[in-house]
Amino acid sequence: MLFRSMRRVHTLVLVPSIESARKINREMTRRGCNLLSDGRPIVGLTSIQLAELVLSLEPKALIIPAHAWTPWFSLYGSMSGFDSIDEAFGPFAKNIYAVETGLSSSPAMNWRIKELDQRAIVSFSDAHSGPKLGREATVFEMPELSYKGIYSAIKQTPVEVGIPLSRIAYTIEFYPEEGKYHYTGHRACGVRLSPEETRAKGVNCPVCGKPLTVGVMQRVEDLASCSEASLELTTINKQLTTNGTSIQVTGSKAFPHRPPFVMLVPLAEIIAESLGAPVASIKVQTTYSRLIEALGGEFTVLLAAQTREIAKLAGERVAVGIDKVRRGEIVIDPGYDGVFGVVKIWRGEEGKPLLEGSREQLSMF
């Protein structure tokens, strides 16, 4: 496919000390890598060369392919990726203990890939956009925060029994449909295809004939060794260690030792739809600031805060919107070819008065 020969993989490298990072930076610079060219520099090393360099200098480094499924610059990307970790990292595949989901895939989608059975699924977020920091996250449980604990939690095999001292408790996810490469499509022609439609119509644009950008969902279908149904996804009540509040997370009966995940919509987007105002508007930003300052941060508002407290600060409609997201009662037009998916909480009912049923629902909290 287009750009298959380039094989560029955005890779995270975690090391236990600043000195280790300096040693790696010095060696990469010596090899001609311009690390100052960009926040995510293209260094001209293959995945095998990068792994060899890093692990020779820091054996305890963690090497994690980032946003593993996006079409470009990713491990499994349809436009420039590989079909397996072995193909990408060769003899160092055994040192790849995790992959990162990216916005357009969920842990459940990754659980369908056989070679990931023995690897952790982690989720992080962009480091280049302040308001979007932490929109996806990995929650660890460990006696004390340390690199050793993080390394141990990520390295351990997901099928191991017992409860280790350091482990991944769960991950916090975007709805993958909201990611901008979830479905296959062609932005210029407004063409968006599900995997079923892609199989029926092919990977050329039905309007102009140009190649489509094959989306993450289609790529997962191409490489999967099992169906989504075989995962036996189920809802689990997970108790937060911070305040004892229970949240609903998604786990798998087929893979019971896999850390579960919870899917969220960014708070500003919920407020914006609830108030019928743009995300960047003063009205939305003021409400957002009021909530996080009073209740203790965006994740606390989205996951743990009592709905009645949210209603006091932001109004009943915002509170009901957050509750609907917690319950998964939303509709999303999937993203494709660089276009983000669109979340709808009220299915076109923006601006209407709060329904009586919603008032009753709110009174339960």
Which stretches of residues belong to each language-model region?
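Active-site neighborhood of phospho(di)ester-bond hydrolases with catalytic His/Asp-centered motifs
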Residues: 1, 64-66, 98-104, 120-128
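C-terminal functional module detector
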Residues: 1, 9, 15, 27-30, ...
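Extended substrate/RNA-proximal surfaces in nucleic-acid metabolism proteins
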Residues: 1-97
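Active-site environment of divalent metal-dependent phosphoester hydrolases
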Residues: 20, 70-73, 104-109, 123-133
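Short amphipathic alpha-helical segments and helix-helix/interface helices
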Residues: 51-55, 109-114
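Short acidic, glycine/serine/threonine-rich loops at helix termini
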Residues: 75-79, 111-112, 133-137
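Extended hydrophobic/aromatic segments used for targeting, binding, or gating
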Residues: 90-91, 105-109, 330
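Short, surface-exposed basic-aromatic patches at helix termini and helix-loop junctions that form
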Residues: 91, 111-120
